Curated annotation (Swiss-Prot):
HAMAP family in the cross-refs: tRNA_Ile2_agm2C_synt
The reaction(s) this protein catalyses: cytidine(34) in tRNA(Ile2) + agmatine + ATP + H2O = 2-agmatinylcytidine(34) in tRNA(Ile2) + AMP + 2 phosphate + 2 H(+)
Class of the enzyme per the UniProt entry, highest EC level: ligase
Family: Belongs to the TiaS family.
Protein's GO biological process: tRNA wobble cytosine modification
Main localization, broad class: cytoplasm
Designated name of the protein: tRNA(Ile2) 2-agmatinylcytidine synthetase TiaS
Chain residues forming the annotated DNA-binding region: 268-342
EC number: 6.3.4.22
Annotated InterPro entries: NA-bd_OB-fold, NA-bd_OB_tRNA, TiaS, TiaS-like_TCKD, TiaS_FLD, tRNA_Ile2__agm2C_synt, Zn_ribbon_TiaS
Source organism superkingdom: Archaea
Keywords associated with the record: ATP-binding, Cytoplasm, Ligase, Nucleotide-binding, tRNA processing
Length: 424
């Protein structure tokens, strides 16, 4: 009998990680049956305000004899109750069990949980219709992700290898050799990616909190991901490693929409015209985009660093495609820019004073006429239009690795442009 197990909302800023629980159970459940595939790490809607750290849920699928089903479920519940950060006010774990094949209604629910806002009440109704068993701890908000991780149709996927720390090391600085990570990246990029930030000269595979994760290496080839890990020098004991199949770096969260159809917490791709000159507030860069159905604000926030320089080059009238998650900023619906593509740029024209026709000197404006600073020649005030280069190419611009969302697909990966500019 196939038993699908989903877990979510077990962590907090103080520690724990749902992937760690998944990796533990992947080993423990092997005494009851055979795993059908690698565990799945499913990232859900990154815009939801009460999400866990990375809004990631985990699911496991095992082929288990019916005699062991109840024992396997009891083990899962016992482990989650023991290790989840239930003391934290915002941690509300959820567990889901489904026996047999995954029904279509659960697949549709998973896609909705990826792209839109879903309530606990909706999840409970879907569980009943799908024949899934749910276990709620506290508010049990985690049942949303638990059910979605089981139902998620992982047609597009990448891999992530996670190495976990021993309990006694989790309050200490992670001891990972920086130079070895850069060397690993040189060897295996782009089959593994987002390992380092080449501009800041920092490594990105190590998180910073008290959670159990020591390093995480992402890639599109599981063999190369494993080899990449072997090339990293780690100066502390590792409890275990686990390879996950995941929807990270797939762009599956993004949906083409007209501006008039956009809702709070959506993840959208929008085609339109720049409707305003950019403005800045608090190191964030903003502009507006419009189509025939409406207008919406777009933001390149401070963590995107040099990416903001490209946004500053956009001019009113430019035709562009933008992509990102929709949140409220200063009470206004705003697309948090992940990438953009200039389709058609308006000419950039600057009006300049001519040189003096007598001596070639510089002309100075004097009300309604011009006067040469060198020879004093006067002439009517006529400015000459000069077309300036735009300094933007017809290509996709993306945020830097350390500002990238888990779900956003880096341009270095195959088919990274298909969803974004394929429909043009």
């Amino acid at each position: 009998m196939l038993l699908h197990i989903g877990l979510d909302d077990t962590d907090s800023p103080n520690g724990m990680c749902t992937t760690y629980l998944g990796a533990l159970l992947y080993r423990e459940l092997s005494r009851f049956g055979e795993p059908v595939d690698l565990p799945k790490l499913i990232r859900l809607n990154p815009n939801i305000p009460y999400k866990t750290r990375g809004n990631g849920a985990v699911s496991l699928t095992f082929d288990i004899l019916e005699d062991y089903l109840n024992e396997a479920k009891e083990l899962v519940v016992k482990t989650v109750k023991k290790l989840a950060e239930v003391e934290h006010e915002n941690t509300n774990p959820g567990i889901a069990f489904l026996e047999g094949e995954v029904p279509e209604i659960l697949r549709r629910f998973a896609i909705k949980a990826l792209r839109e806002h879903v309530t606990i009440d909706e999840a409970e109704k879907i569980a009943k219709k799908a024949g899934a068993e749910i276990v709620k701890l506290k508010l049990g908000r985690g049942i949303i992700g638990a059910l979605a991780s089981i139902g998620y149709p992982l047609n597009n996927y990448t891999y992530e290898l996670l190495a976990y720390r021993k309990l006694e090391n989790r309050e200490k600085v992670r001891r990972v050799d920086r130079d070895s990570v850069f060397e690993m990246d040189r060897k295996f990029y782009p089959f593994t990616y987002d390992n380092v930030d080449p501009f800041k000269k920092t490594i990105l595979i190590t998180p910073h909190g008290k959670d159990p994760v020591l390093v995480g290496i992402r890639g599109i080839d599981k063999g190369k991901v494993l080899l990449a890990y072997e090339n990293v020098i780690i100066n502390e004991n590792v409890e275990m490693i686990q390879l996950f199949k995941t929807n990270q770096s797939t762009d599956d969260h993004l949906v083409w929409k007209k501006i008039g159809d956009i809702k709070l917490y959506d993840n959208v791709i929008v085609k339109g015209k720049v409707a305003s000159k950019y403005w800045e507030r608090g190191r964030h860069v903003f502009f507006e985009i419009e189509d025939e159905t409406g207008k919406i604000r777009v933001a390149a926030f401070e963590p995107t660093k040099k990416f903001r320089n490209y946004v500053r080059k956009l001019l009113p009238g430019d035709e562009v495609i933008v992509a990102g998650g929709v949140k409220e900023h200063e009470g206004v619906l705003t697309i948090n820019l992940e990438k953009f593509y200039p389709i058609k740029l308006v000419p950039k024209v600057e009006y300049r004073k001519p040189k003096c026709p007598k001596c070639g000197g510089t002309m100075k404006s004097k009300g309604d006429y011009l006067k040469c600073k060198r020879c004093g020649y006067k002439m009517p005030k006529v400015l000459i239009p000069v077309k300036l280069p735009r300094d933007l190419e017809r290509k996709i611009y993306e945020v830097p690795p350390d500002a990238r969302k888990h779900l956003s697909r880096p341009l270095v990966l195959p088919k990274s442009e298909d969803k974004f500019i394929g429909p043009l």
